[in-house]
């Protein structure tokens, strides 16, 4: 029985994922998926997407530690980590996951604030007179 480790990232969220063959148990920050989410169905589907696409929701156990960012970024980091772990588990899953963009790191992050501006691009109000 081998244990596969993968890391998923999104914005400032980082997910460390361990995947082992098992009965379909999902543990995030030592809580079940429903406890961790608090009933957000859309976010739950986002996390479960790679498992549902590869039909592995009942045959692998996943233990994950997620930190940084908000719930949505954490869920997407978790999805990225699970996808990378499934790819390492069976290379045949790559043909399913790659076209859906689940193995690609979403590199969009918040643009930094510049001096002389109110935000990253928002300038102070301009007055001609």
Swiss-Prot record:
GO CC annotation terms, alphabetical: cytosolic small ribosomal subunit
Any one Gene Ontology MF annotation carried by this entry is: structural constituent of ribosome
Superkingdom of the source?
A: Bacteria
Is Ribonucleoprotein there in the keyword field? yes
GO BP terms: translation
Q: Which InterPro entries match?
A: Ribosomal_Su5_D2-typ_SF, Ribosomal_uS9, Ribosomal_uS9_bac/plastid, Ribosomal_uS9_CS, Ribsml_uS5_D2-typ_fold_subgr
Q: Which family does it belong to?
A: Belongs to the universal ribosomal protein uS9 family.
Q: What is this protein called?
A: Small ribosomal subunit protein uS9
